[in-house]
Amino acid sequence: MTLTLNRQLLSSRQILVAFSGGLDSTVLLHQLVQWRTENPGVTLRAIHVHHGLSANADAWVKHCENICQQWQVPLVVERVQLAQEGLGIEAQARQARYQAFARTLLPGEVLVTAQHLDDQCETFLLALKRGSGPAGLSAMAEVSEFAGTQLIRPLLARTRGELEQWALAHGLRWIEDESNQDDSYDRNFLRLRVVPLLQQRWPHFAEATARSAALCAEQESLLDELLADDLAHCQTPQGTLQIAPMLAMSDARRAAIIRRWLAGQNAPMPSRDALVRIWQEVALAREDASPCLRLGAFEIRRYQSQLWWIKSVAGQSETILPWQTWLQPLELPAGLGSVQLTAGGDIRPPRADEAVSVRFKAPGLLHIVGRNGGRKLKKIWQELGVPPWLRDTTPLLFYGETLIAAAGVFVTQEGVAVGENGVSFVWQKTLSQVKAG
């Protein structure tokens, strides 16, 4: 057996290898080290993710360090914590791994992982168990986009048995994760109990599922082409999805558009039931409603006749953040980012006797620049087109008990700089907040 060097891998000169220390990634790294010897211009690094789930995790790190030192491969060790609500341990671990991969990738690097044919078969069967359509049944692609670069799986056509033969022939050492024998995990149940029976009855079952996955991928790619114009017509430059153009579509066409829109938001694929609920409970909710459907750590909302995909963030209406050192940035709660006052702008700086704070609600009638008369904050949000989910998470700058400005939205008449150098109230948002508005 030799490594399948596809064109993308052959053209890559900087490679980051996901290295768990197990059989699969050990064989992959070994073959890439050999390939590097034949191609001196190739830069090879490895990353090991420490999940903290096993008592042996520290020993696995040491093993990977020893192997990489022996093979002269720089190793990055990323320690992660699993705390994503609504996901099982398997999904949490996978999400944490790929987040670590994305953080570690250097410009120009590609990520290479060691999934093989048996993994592909298990992925297909898991998708089948979930009732997935062609997108889910496509399983894993040999080359896919990831974190602004490429994710390459060069062993996808090889069986685990072939990898083991390679490892034994070359005297390789690898670790065995004890959790791989726990069949309470779905993938392990398939690997230990189901697939061996299928392979015993039909020896080429894994190859057949790989062909089916490839056919599903072809069909999905064709649908992407056929629906590209519809999606472009429905999607706004801000990444939201207009509801009106979808009203006349068939249920199947509309569902396909919504799936592709969500895929563009890097959202997990919703179930068929979730797609129905997105349309019936969110898109078609009564006009005066503010519908919301939560999917994992995200929400689908409707606002201004558009669907929005946003990160779930707890409201902060009762939060008051004293800002005594207002010359320095202030970190906001709930992953909302930070705020700072920067030189140059139309907001007056605070006087020495004014305590500065950041809040998320303001009582009474407010007088803002550009509007005549006083208005309650709720009315101002509505007039300025601020989505409901941002109204109690948008930072408000106070001097004493006086509202001065809403970050990026408005300045009050009491906050205007007159005859003095002004400042700007700048909100450094997280990525999810930027996408949400």
UniProtKB/Swiss-Prot annotation:
It is found in: Cytoplasm. One of its GO terms (cellular component) is cytoplasm. Gene3D superfamilies: 1.20.59.20, HUPs. GO terms for molecular function: ATP binding; tRNA(Ile)-lysidine synthase activity. ATP binds at S20, G21, G22, L23, D24, S25. InterPro entries: Lysidine-tRNA-synth_C, Rossmann-like_a/b/a_fold, TilS/TtcA_N, tRNA_Ile_lys_synt, tRNA_Ile_lys_synt_N, tRNA_Ile_lys_synt_subst-bd. One of its GO terms (biological process) is tRNA modification. The keyword Transcription regulation does not apply. It catalyses: cytidine(34) in tRNA(Ile2) + L-lysine + ATP = lysidine(34) in tRNA(Ile2) + AMP + diphosphate + H(+). It holds the Pfam family TilS_C. Keywords: ATP-binding, Cytoplasm, Ligase, Nucleotide-binding, tRNA processing. The N-terminal region contains the highly conserved SGGXDS motif, predicted to be a P-loop motif involved in ATP binding. Ligates lysine onto the cytidine present at position 34 of the AUA codon-specific tRNA(Ile) that contains the anticodon CAU, in an ATP-dependent manner. Cytidine is converted to lysidine, thus changing the amino acid specificity of the tRNA from methionine to isoleucine. Belongs to the tRNA(Ile)-lysidine synthase family. This is tRNA(Ile)-lysidine synthase. It comes from Escherichia coli O6:H1 (strain CFT073 / ATCC 700928 / UPEC). The lineage of its organism: Bacteria, Pseudomonadati, Pseudomonadota, Gammaproteobacteria, Enterobacterales.
